Amino acid sequence: MRKTSSFERSGRVAPVYRGEKRKTSGPLAVRLIMTAATTLGCALSGWSQAAPQLPDDNGKETVQKACASCHSLATVINAGHNQQGWNSVVHMMVNAGAPVPKEQMATVIEYLTKYFPEKPAPEAVVIPGSVEVSIKEWQVPTPGSRPHDPAYAPDGSVWYTGQMANVLGRFDPETDQFKEYPLKTPDSGPHGLLPDKDGNIWFTANFKAYIGKLDPKTGDVTEYPMPDSRARDPHTLIFAPNGNIYFTVQGGNMVGRLNPKTGEVKVVSSPTPKSNPYGMAVNSKGIPFFVEFGSNKVASLDPDTLSIHEYVLPHVDSRPRRVAITPDDAIWYTDYSRGYLGRLDSATGKVSEWASPGGPRSRPYGITAVDDMLWYSESNTRPNTVVRFDPKTEKFQTWIIPSGGGVVRNMVHTPEGNLWLACSGVNGIAFVEVKNAAKISSRN
């Protein structure tokens, strides 16, 4: 049964789905399985073990050179976009330093569109349950900004990284007003972000190799450059209880630490080559954990020495992308390549897995933990879904994102247990209000 809620999206009523299990499909405003340039460049290189060959045609040599500068050509073979999608991906690659001459970009886009077209996406699967939610969405002010990550600030505002517009955005849910803050370095590619207790917003400049701090009161941005030229693309960042910021460097294959008091930045390489450190979270003991999107591994980082301990996941094709930690210090990750939700017990190394409702091509992505409940997105279903998993009952419940989502890359929760999503491909943000479930905040 399909019901509608009373919320509005751009002046229109948007649906909330409840009732019996059903499959639903619908057009997306923009269908981009778009990644930050280094994500396209590095993340999926392990999916195909065979050495692929590109078709002979104009653009082949440039594609081969540009893609091989960061990743296996299997990435291109496994990818698929329409012309608009490849246009966005190629521009992101160039922003991140891929060697594609400006005069050859049109040829490269035409080549990729011709030989690696968009692939059919799996239909979203709606699983009913007892929890009720409503979903409200907003378009961000700058077209084509592609919000990548959201963050919830102590004053109740919601922030997002406008990655392709070179802005940080602030949204006030009380007034429905947006304000965007331009960054001083062009094409910084803001990616991850988080607020501090003083109201500053810290972010990673994925295209320009620095971590930034925005003072919303003045608009001033302080930049902390990476100390190693290989650390070209800082990705996800977190605060630890000791006050330091820890972060991943995806294509640079590193993780690092920034001391906000001194400005000192240190980076170390991942033990596994091309492991592409991606999502990161911190446990109750103050130990950062991160997932390796280029390998089948989860890793912990000693906050003092920066030594790394890796945990090998049982399936060789696993590619964990984002991570969340529940109060029992269980490590939960979205297995993007296989369509699974995974749980790692770091004390024993035991791994448990559950197939995501949307199937092996659903591409689970952004994830957060609200107390012991897991919430995540399926980024490749049509439309995208919000998924809730109860570890005690091992049951899923899912909801469709009315706009389609257009690849929900990350999500955060509020102290009340509601969710904010960054809907990259449809250029928006979304609020998921959880109406009738226990909503206890987990650690940030």
Which stretches of residues belong to each language-model region?
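Electrostatic cytochrome c docking/interface patches
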Residues: 46-62
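Conserved beta-strand positions in repeat-built beta-propeller and related beta-rich domains
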Residues: 158-164, 201-207, 245-251, 288-294, ...
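C-terminal capping alpha-helices of c-type cytochrome domains
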Residues: 96-124, 199, 417-419
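A short helix->beta-strand "capping" segment at the edge of beta-propeller domains
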Residues: 126-144
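The canonical Cys-X-X-Cys-His
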Residues: 64-74, 108, 112
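Beta-rich, blade/repeat-based domains predominating
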Residues: 143-155, 186-198, 229-242, 272-288, ...
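Blade-level signature of beta-propeller repeat domains, shared across WD40, Kelch, NHL, RCC1
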Residues: 406-444
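Short loop/turn segments that connect beta-strands within beta-propeller blades
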Residues: 172-176, 215-219, 259-263, 302-306, ...
